[in-house]
Structure formats: structure tokens, C-alpha cells
């Protein structure tokens, strides 16, 4: 009989406005800047034994502003930049769709565009993550909602769009000033719940 996979907790991170500066559509690598504390935050998660997974809507693909190869290049550059701080991302997951705008097969409703939980559920399956012991950090209500719909706790950060936002239909489990503040709160919870 096969042994069941051991699961671990994770911290899911929105990308734009949470890890890196919000610049509208990140369509050039020279626009990419990590937010202060992002490297330290990811490194702290790594040291805790939790996985770190980026979950991001990238409708710019569907709108024809850039392609999936470019998104891969952005993620490689984020990994390189975080690596300089001794931090590692365990996985990047993105949704290229938009329900009302876009080209070809990218223009459609889907289960992966936040606030739908599809990307978190896929990552949990592929990376053996226990969602009930996990967290989703983001700067928008849809990030919080996606995490909570997947069974994780949702944390709203006041960077990116979060500066001017309160939670929408899902009240966050915590509101933090930035990613580092959010991670310190998570680690203060005892890593798992």
C-alpha cells in the first residue's frame, strides 16, 4: 500500500503589490522592484519549514500585453532577486485569463482567477500542502477571499492596492502593514493552527 504524502503548511503570496511594487501591468523587467522586506519575509518563511508559493492573476497575457514566456522571465528574475537575500520560492502559479476582455482562449471565466481558489487548490495538490494550516497574503480583497475559499487564512497587506482597501466580501483574518509584518504575525501564531 502506498504511503500517504506528508503535507506541509504554506504561505501563499500574491505577486504585484505584495512581493514587488505595483506598477499596473508589469510588462518590462526594468519595472520590477521588490518591496522592502520581501526578501527577509520569504527567508523567514523558508526557515520556518513552511512552503512559499506565489499565486498571481496575469490577465495582461489574455489582453495581449505580454506572453506566458515573459511571465516566466519575471518569475525567474524574482527568484534571482530573492535568492540574493537567501530566500526561495517553492512554486509560481498564474492565471492568464480574463472573463470579459482578452484574446482567443484567454477570454473566459475560469476557476484559477482569484478570487476563485483554483490556483491554491492546484498548488496544494502538486506540492503536498495542507491548506487548513496555510495562509494567503495579498494586497486585495480577492487575494484574501481566494485563500479563505481554499481553506487557508487570509491576510491583507497595506502595500500595493491594499493602502486604500479594506476587505470585500471576506473579512481578512489579519491586516498587516506589509509582507514582513504579515509573516511575523504568521510565525507568532506558531506556524500551524
What are these regions (language model features)?
Residues 78-83, 124:
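Conserved hydrophobic residues forming the short capping helix/wall of the S-adenosyl-L-methionine
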Residues 108-144:
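Conserved Lys-Pro-Asp/Glu-containing loop-to-beta segment of HAD-superfamily phosphomonoesterases
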Residues 135-174:
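Acidic, Mg2+-coordinating phosphoryl-transfer loop and its flanking beta/alpha structural elements
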Residues 38, 42-78, 87-101, 147:
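Substrate-recognition element of Asp-dependent hydrolases with the DxDx(T/V) motif
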Amino acid at each position: 500500500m502506498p504511503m500517504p504524502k506528508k503535507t506541509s503548511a504554506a504561505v501563499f503570496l500574491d505577486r504585484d503589490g505584495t512581493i514587488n511594487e505595483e506598477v499596473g501591468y508589469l510588462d518590462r523587467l526594468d519595472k520590477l522592484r521588490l518591496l522592502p522586506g520581501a526578501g527577509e519575509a520569504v527567508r523567514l518563511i523558508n526557515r520556518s519549514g513552511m512552503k512559499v508559493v506565489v499565486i498571481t492573476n496575469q490577465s495582461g497575457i489574455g489582453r495581449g500585453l505580454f506572453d506566458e514566456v515573459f511571465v516566466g522571465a519575471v518569475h525567474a528574475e524574482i527568484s534571482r532577486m530573492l535568492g540574493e537575500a537567501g530566500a526561495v520560492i517553492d512554486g509560481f502559479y498564474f492565471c492568464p485569463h480574463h472573463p470579459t476582455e482578452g484574446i482567443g482562449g484567454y477570454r473566459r471565466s475560469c476557476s484559477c482567477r482569484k478570487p476563485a481558489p483554483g490556483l491554491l487548490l492546484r498548488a496544494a495538490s502538486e506540492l503536498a500542502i495542507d491548506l487548513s494550516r496555510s495562509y494567503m497574503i495579498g494586497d486585495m480583497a480577492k487575494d484574501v477571499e481566494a485563500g479563505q475559499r481554499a481553506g487557508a487564512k487570509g491576510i491583507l497587506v497595506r502595500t500595493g492596492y491594499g493602502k486604500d482597501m479594506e476587505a470585500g466580501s471576506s473579512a481578512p483574518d489579519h491586516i498587516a502593514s506589509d509582507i514582513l509584518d504579515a509573516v511575523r504575525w504568521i510565525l507568532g501564531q506558531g506556524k500551524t493552527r
